[in-house]
């Protein structure tokens, strides 16, 4: 049995992520999906909480025929210990899929098999672009699986994003 690890911020989860995960699912038996930067929320580039992102991913993958686990992963300030941090919070995995150069480097240095996951129509399926559309009041729902749009609407995520994107709210407490 082969279990893979794939991490993303999923701010929000979109069809690009969905295509990559579907492709990974063809190659492995189980998949651990890490919700990266889990401690971040209520910011312009990270508007959604870890729990909200877990729901987005879980609901979007409900019909995927692969056993999967969705695990929040907080950032650590030291890249040299990040892989150990990830491993300590997830079920064991055999292979890592990523297109992030730092993630690839860190996991390779730690002795993991790493496969690069190509971006899927990046210019269209980008969290940055989807958040921009939300802020500007443009259509965005067609860029995410329906269950993701439903999760975002359930807590009025677009209003939150608009509120935290205003200049007066861009400060840390």
UniProtKB/Swiss-Prot annotation:
One GO cellular component this record assigns the protein to is: cytoplasm
- Give the catalysed reaction(s), semicolon-separated: beta-nicotinamide D-ribonucleotide + ATP + H(+) = diphosphate + NAD(+)
Compartments where located: Cytoplasm
Cite the GO molecular-function annotations of the record.
ATP binding; nicotinamide-nucleotide adenylyltransferase activity
- Any single GO BP term: NAD biosynthetic process
Pfam families named in the record: CTP_transf_like
* Key words, A-Z: ATP-binding, Cytoplasm, NAD, Nucleotide-binding, Nucleotidyltransferase, Pyridine nucleotide biosynthesis, Transferase
* EC class (word): transferase
Fetch the InterPro entries from UniProt.
Cyt_trans-like, NMN_Atrans_arc, Rossmann-like_a/b/a_fold
Pathway(s) the chain acts in = Cofactor biosynthesis; NAD(+) biosynthesis; NAD(+) from nicotinamide D-ribonucleotide: step 1/1
As recorded in UniProt, its EC number(s) are 2.7.7.1
HAMAP family with a match to the protein in the record: NMN_adenylyltr (MF_00243)
Which family is this protein grouped under? Answer: Belongs to the archaeal NMN adenylyltransferase family.
Q: Any idea what this protein is called?
A: Nicotinamide-nucleotide adenylyltransferase
